[in-house]
């Protein structure tokens, strides 16, 4: 077990009640970062919060949008649940698993059973209506953007991300961790791009920790916001400046493995990874094609403090996903490279539950094809997951022998 420290204590309830008495509406808090999210009708009330001795600073993170896109009330009618069977057991998902020898882990009986994965994303459109998810174990859902919304009526991005790991329909599509259990958490508001989404993410990852999650996949990243004053600079990619990176770094200290997409800014002026991909002791995943060549759009490292990023690469070009109609489709993005790899790491952790987060990351690095010469494009390269398993077994034998 891990020692309890001050970051395990909730934000003082008396402080929250004081802010409420001054006109604030409580939304959420982060015990790890010692922050609280309050909604106020005007800025003057927020400024009065500074009169309290327990308030160090305030920051505007959300402005109510002028309009919100209407949700599709007839969403389930979009689902056709039609697909073609393939000869290969993995169906459309074969290439993205076999490029890492993930099928060897599966053949050895390690398909993620007993591992809990939280997917923190933008919505899980129609997952509840798609037969292709019928063999997927979903433990629960929570919406940190709008707790009263229908998480299955929100954006389809999280559904596609989930499918890379969780689908278990042989000869149609089998994901990388078909026997793991999943929490579906929404932190991303697709209608706007505001810093509050970092607060939502911080609340979501702390919730994941509280319910016993082992691994978090997040195919989200932020550096540019609706108000340019909130934008990050490269110098801030230090693993601690952004709230999300700080929370992801804390998660690692609490024993959670965070697997994160590198970002799709490789061809933009920004080019770099996006927070929380700069966090410490997490796995940041870039995108390759089925030949192992990096995707031009895949964001590059390193972090501002010189750590190698991305960590490793997975298929993010022509990745097999579930489409909005419930059939299989292909998509591009580090958003899909991340869950593909996340599922494989879940299988590895099932096989080697004695590994710490840092040891997991270590064997992943050592089992990758550029381990001897990592760079800021490929990181440590493409991981052989069977080799990672063998290295983990050797590590245990060496440790037990001492």
At which residue positions do the language-model features occur?
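Aromatic- and Gly/Pro-rich amphipathic surface segment
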Residues: 1-22
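Structural recognition of the beta-strand scaffold that forms the well-ordered cores
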Residues: 28, 35-39, 59, 116-121, ...
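Solvent-exposed loop/turn segments at secondary-structure junctions
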Residues: 33-34, 43-45, 64-66, 122-126, ...
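Subtilisin-like serine protease catalytic core
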Residues: 103-142, 147-197, 211-214, 227, ...
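Substrate-binding/access-modulating region of protease and related hydrolase catalytic domains
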Residues: 106, 168-171, 184-278, 291, ...
